[in-house]
Amino acid sequence: MQTAYWMMVMMMVWITAPLSEGGQLNDVIRGLVPDNLAPQLVLQSLDSRRHPHGIRQDGAQICIWKICPPSPWRRLGS
């Protein structure tokens, strides 16, 4: 139980420390997610099952999540 408590404390420090240095919460959260778990790549892997050869036919560009501009639906929510 004590180990779980200290793990939670360390995770909170790890997440909030960059905020005290002027970072934004979205940047901190995105920094915790590996690039191969980007939403675009997950959707592409799910969608590739529908296409022969595993390649999307519309030629959609998939970029690295950390440097992509936000999609239009994310802009509307903010």
Swiss-Prot record:
Listed disulfide bonds for this chain? 63-68
Q: Where in the cell is it found?
A: Secreted
Which organism encodes this protein?
Answer: Conus terebra
Q: Name one GO cellular component term.
A: extracellular region
Provide the organism lineage as a comma list: Eukaryota, Metazoa, Spiralia, Lophotrochozoa, Mollusca
- Domain annotation text? The cysteine framework is C-C.
Q: Which residues form the signal peptide?
A: 1-22
The entry's protein name is Consomatin Te1
List modified residues, type 4-hydroxyproline.
69-70, 72
Instruction: Tell me which UniProt keywords the record has, alphabetically.
Output: Cleavage on pair of basic residues, D-amino acid, Disulfide bond, G-protein coupled receptor impairing toxin, Hydroxylation, Secreted, Signal, Toxin
Tell me which residues bear D-tryptophan.
Answer: 65
- Propeptide ranges are 23-56, 74-78
Tell me where it mainly resides.
Answer: secreted
Q: What does this protein's UniProt record list under function?
A: Moderately activates human somatostatin receptors (SSTR) with a preferential activation of SSTR1 and SSTR4. In vivo, does not cause behavioral changes in mice within a few minutes of intracranial injection, but causes a progressive loss of movement thereafter. Four to five hours after injection, mice recover, even with the highest dose tested. Shows antinociception and antihyperalgesia activities in two mouse models of acute pain, most probably by acting outside the central nervous system.
Family to which the UniProt record says this protein belongs: Belongs to the conotoxin C superfamily. Consomatin family.
